[in-house]
Amino acid sequence: MKQVQTKRDWKKLAYDVVEEKMIAKEDAIAILEAEDTEVLEIMNAAYIIRHHYFGKKVKLNMIINTKSGLCPEDCGYCSQSIISEAPIDKYAWLTQEKIVEGAHEAIRRKAGTYCIVASGRRPTDKEVNHVIGAVKEIRETTDLKICCCLGFLNEDQAGRLAEAGVHRYNHNLNTHANNYENICSTHTYDDRVDTVQKAKQAGISPCSGAIFGMGETIEERAEIAFELQRIDADSIPCNFLVAVKGTPLEGQKELTPVECLKVLAMMRFVNPTKEIRISGGREINLRSVQPIGLFAANSIFVGDYLTTAGQEPTADWGMIEDLGFEIEECAL
């Protein structure tokens, strides 16, 4: 049951964070449970933190889906899962040439980070070599930072990706540990944490976030932010469930735009120095309040996602310019 809370001084809480005072879990929950009428005040406070560490810069990232569908995992949210009946394109690995071409498209879209993503539980050594070949050519011909998201890794694979010049590895926690078995049965929450740690141990910057709106409680939503703090994720993608028809979660109620804003603000308060990225579901869930999200977040994807469409890059550039913000190109 939602408790009645006295109104907090959100700006004071923000200045405490800037002075390197960690907020309590109760404060994070209070942000999520605040009245909707307080959301602009909360976002204003979140911007104090965001501006202190990142100024007016916005980082752009672009995804390429190098292998679509055909995944043996049963993640309930995912249209690429073996149990999904969603009508998506399914294809095996793109050629190295296509992956490299995507990097140059990322530059045209003013992205600084290029994310090479493949469906599946884990890559084979042959598949890792395929990615490494493309990564080396991209590193030789561009200044892009490269992120990979290929599934579970072993130590040797993580080390070889690092040696090839991969800057960042994405492996999301997805949801709270207590909620994980409701979302997936083919692997565990701890499996995901293990891969994040392997990437970090190999010298790759860890990228890990969550998909909000998958049945987690408000308290669990806050605890996810603290867990991401604990594993020291450098980049935190905040995804909002898009209840895709044909997936087990197709009937799940999606978060409202205001709920999404509260999540972004809460994540900024808990992880003040980290890259907070508005990721999957941005256009669908935040809708007309997308620009407000950038008062907490400092990063977005530009273009399409894995199996859902994003808005035109020109719309994102215009949104950033209209806010008085600046695109940070070719920066991790």
Swiss-Prot record:
GO molecular function: 2 iron, 2 sulfur cluster binding; 4 iron, 4 sulfur cluster binding; biotin synthase activity; iron ion binding
Pathway membership, UniProt: Cofactor biosynthesis; biotin biosynthesis; biotin from 7,8-diaminononanoate: step 2/2
Binding site for [4Fe-4S] cluster: C71, C75, C78
Assembly: Homodimer.
UniProt keyword terms in alphabetical order: 2Fe-2S, 4Fe-4S, Biotin biosynthesis, Iron, Iron-sulfur, Metal-binding, S-adenosyl-L-methionine, Transferase
Family: Belongs to the radical SAM superfamily. Biotin synthase family.
Top-rank taxon: Bacteria
Necessary cofactors: [4Fe-4S] cluster; [2Fe-2S] cluster
Entry protein name: Biotin synthase
Entry binding sites for [2Fe-2S] cluster: C115, C147, C207, R277
GO biological process annotation, one example: biotin biosynthetic process
Reaction(s) catalysed by this chain's protein: (4R,5S)-dethiobiotin + (sulfur carrier)-SH + 2 reduced [2Fe-2S]-[ferredoxin] + 2 S-adenosyl-L-methionine = (sulfur carrier)-H + biotin + 2 5'-deoxyadenosine + 2 L-methionine + 2 oxidized [2Fe-2S]-[ferredoxin]
E.C. no: 2.8.1.6
Cofactor binding notes: Binds 1 [4Fe-4S] cluster. The cluster is coordinated with 3 cysteines and an exchangeable S-adenosyl-L-methionine. Binds 1 [2Fe-2S] cluster. The cluster is coordinated with 3 cysteines and 1 arginine.
Function per UniProt: Catalyzes the conversion of dethiobiotin (DTB) to biotin by the insertion of a sulfur atom into dethiobiotin via a radical-based mechanism.
Stretches assigned to the Radical SAM core domain: 53-282
